[in-house]
Amino acid sequence: KVYGVAKWGETPLEGVEVKLAGEGLEDISATTDAEGKYELTGVKADEAYTLTAEDKTGEFRAVESQEVNSDVDTEKNFAFSIIPISVSIDKTGVKPFSYKRALDFSGTAVKAYVVKKVNRNYTELTEIQKVPAGCGVILKADADEHSVTPVEKADAVEGNLLVGTVDKEFTIEAASVGKAWSLKKNDGIMQFMSEAGTKVAKNSAYLAYESTESVIYLNQTDGIRVITTSGNGMLDESKPMYNLAGQMVGKDYKGVVIQNGKKYNK
């Protein structure tokens, strides 16, 4: 018999078709199991066979065939490498996203963010480079097709409020209004909205957060709704203040500043 295992790194690959073929000989084939293992029996002694392994998912690069010519049990293993995926970012520069395998965004032009906190009516984004399988993220990049390489594993992300839709699309039902939010562009601003009947596409993500706000903005600057002036006791110049670009400013700064999710004319 001929036996072995098909792997991607340390990950066993199920469903790989392994075949023995020889001139004038009947093909012998098997499919790898959940542990990536296969076994071919009925191999004729002293015959020349070519052993091939084919990934039917299209996720992995083809591997070289191997020659088999033996009258004893022979172990033949296959090491597959994965093909990078293409991630399309439209002109908004923003994309809610999830994928069935872990992804590594380091070294790419794409930045990946999770949401660990909602501050009133805007999200606070945390950048991560390695995204676990199935994890919902917000991607930011220039409009283009970006190549990203799947990896075997990535550390779990605790407290992420984004839910990935890897297996199927998600519909916001009436009972989920105010609890599930889809990201869309409205009046030129990226914002999460919670409307019954809204469909979130497969391989996307939605925000799972209970709120009575009408919208939840993606960015702090967009989420500021209260404009007031200094001198009314609300602005505390001893605490951090930021300009509209998100840069910390000092007490001498003049203009619009942001503090604790509010905008002030200073």
Residue ranges and their predicted role:
Residues I82-S106, Q129-I224:
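A short, polar beta-strand/turn micro-motif
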Residues K1, D73-I83:
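Conserved "repeat-terminator" motif of extracellular CCP/Sushi domains
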Residues D222-K266:
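C-terminal outer-membrane/trafficking sorting elements
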